[in-house]
């Protein structure tokens, strides 16, 4: 009885080819693609092209009746000098910006709203950004002549009223931490991207947060902050800076495909030359 082992051997051969190709992709081509694109990204966009400034590094003035104001001075850094990054340590720090450069501001606001009444959970949060210290908390309409409002918007938020409470079912469902329940039910998240422009010639920037209804208290989450991004003339660089993670996925995929094509062409060329060499050696023999 003859046993045909050609099929299992052929299957084993092709399986080994697939495993080798997968290992080359995983251990050589993919890391090489990541390194090449990372170097390409840093050449186009230096590490100091953006800076995340937490709101807890601003000077803060609170007023339940009149809102909360965050203001900080700007320090212009000349070209050729390293641009420092803001340290998230809760201490007031000047905002470093490259001299003669326009910036775009991305706001990431996370906050709780407490109501002193037992009704009206829904409210509007008024957001104003000023060039300068901005208005006094007691007189929102009376700003300094040097101040310039460069952005305004209103966003709906949910406020925690006096009669609101957490049920045992909610606590059991979301975990033993009551703060997790508050995060799930009452944490308001507002993101505003690519709508605010700021020049490094400004001396001060201030962000003014106020609810339409007076009897509210805002509690700012420590993750809140403002991302300062350099505004380049090339739209592609701005997009890469805004969507860094997405640009890495696309860029690495492109370089991965290019390297795979080069590997394939090189492998086919080497295979053809080897076959020709074998054929010539057979003819001579």
Swiss-Prot record:
Q: How does it sit in the membrane?
A: Multi-pass membrane protein
Question: Where is this chain primarily localised?
Answer: endoplasmic reticulum
List all topological domains (Lumenal).
38-244
Q: Name one GO cellular component term.
A: endoplasmic reticulum
Q: Briefly state the protein's biological role.
A: Involved in lipid metabolism and lipid droplet (LD) morphology, number, and size. Facilitates initiation of LD formation, and ensures that vectorial budding of LDs from the ER is directed towards the cytoplasm.
Looking at the keywords, is Ribosomal protein present?
A: no
Q: What family does the Swiss-Prot or TrEMBL record give for this protein?
A: Belongs to the seipin family.
Localization (cell): Endoplasmic reticulum membrane
Q: Which residues lie on this side of the membrane: Cytoplasmic?
A: 1-16, 266-285
What keywords would UniProt list here?
Endoplasmic reticulum, Lipid metabolism, Membrane, Transmembrane, Transmembrane helix
A GO biological process of this protein is: protein localization to lipid droplet
Chain ranges passing through the membrane: 17-37, 245-265
Domain of life assignment: Eukaryota
Q: Which GO terms describe its molecular function?
A: identical protein binding
**Record's protein name:** Seipin
């Amino acid at each position: 009885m003859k046993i045909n082992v050609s099929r299992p051997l052929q299957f084993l051969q092709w399986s080994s080819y697939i495993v080798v190709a997968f290992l080359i992709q995983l251990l050589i081509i993919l890391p090489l693609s990541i390194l090449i694109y990372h170097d390409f990204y840093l050449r186009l966009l230096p590490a100091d092209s953006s800076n995340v400034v937490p709101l807890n590094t601003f000077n803060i003035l609170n007023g339940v009746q009149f809102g909360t104001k965050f203001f900080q001075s700007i320090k212009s850094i000349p070209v050729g000098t390293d641009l420092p990054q803001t340290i998230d340590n809760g201490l007031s720090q000047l905002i470093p910006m490259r001299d003669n450069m326009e910036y775009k501001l991305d706001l990431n606001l996370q906050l709780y709203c407490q109501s002193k009444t037992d009704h009206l959970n829904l409210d509007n949060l008024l957001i104003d950004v000023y060039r300068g210290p901005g208005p006094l908390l007691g007189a929102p309409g009376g700003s300094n002549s040097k101040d310039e409002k460069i952005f305004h918007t209103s966003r709906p938020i949910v406020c925690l009223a006096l009669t609101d409470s957490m049920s045992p079912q909610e606590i059991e469902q979301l975990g033993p931490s009551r703060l997790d329940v508050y995060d799930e039910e009452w944490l308001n998240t507002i993101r505003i991207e690519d709508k605010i422009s700021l020049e490094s010639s400004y001396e001060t920037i201030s962000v003014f947060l106020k609810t339409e209804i007076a009897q509210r208290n805002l509690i700012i989450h420590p993750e809140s902050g403002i991302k300062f991004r350099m505004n380049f003339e090339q739209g592609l660089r701005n997009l890469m800076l805004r969507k860094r993670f997405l640009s890495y996925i696309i860029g690495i995929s492109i370089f991965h495909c290019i390297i795979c094509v080069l590997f394939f062409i090189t492998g086919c060329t080497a295979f053809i030359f080897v076959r020709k060499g074998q054929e010539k050696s057979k003819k001579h023999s």
